[in-house]
Amino acid sequence: MQNPSKAEIKEILQRSKRIAVVGLSDRPDRTSHMVSKAMQDAGYEIIPVNPTIDEALGVKAVSSLKEIDGPIDIVNVFRRSEQLPGVAEEFLETDAPVFWAQQGLVNEEAYQMLKEKGRTVIMDLCIKVAHAVTK
């Protein structure tokens, strides 16, 4: 498994506008909330994807990626590593080009599934940190 280069990640972040966040919590003390808030503050549109909440960051939550209207640039995932193949399968039903699993999340099965379909895959990297170091 290999992530795109720092230059490629910078380009992905520069061209992207909408980030669907799978597993986004409505609790401000959760990492998913803090990272997504930072990305929202940086100008990205955040779409919460979590069937157990009504909204997060002032945005109505959807229960699955399939419920999102319009294009998705990045799907940022805050789920356990063993759940990544299931998220990847749902991701492949969208037109989103980039699957981004947060720091500490790696799953070789999901990685191979997505690469075989020509999608960009980033794993084990915090999107907030990547955004900060590639500005």
Swiss-Prot record:
A Pfam family recorded for this sequence: CoA_binding_2
UniProt superkingdom: Bacteria
GO cellular component: cytoplasm; cytosol
Protein name: Uncharacterized protein YneT
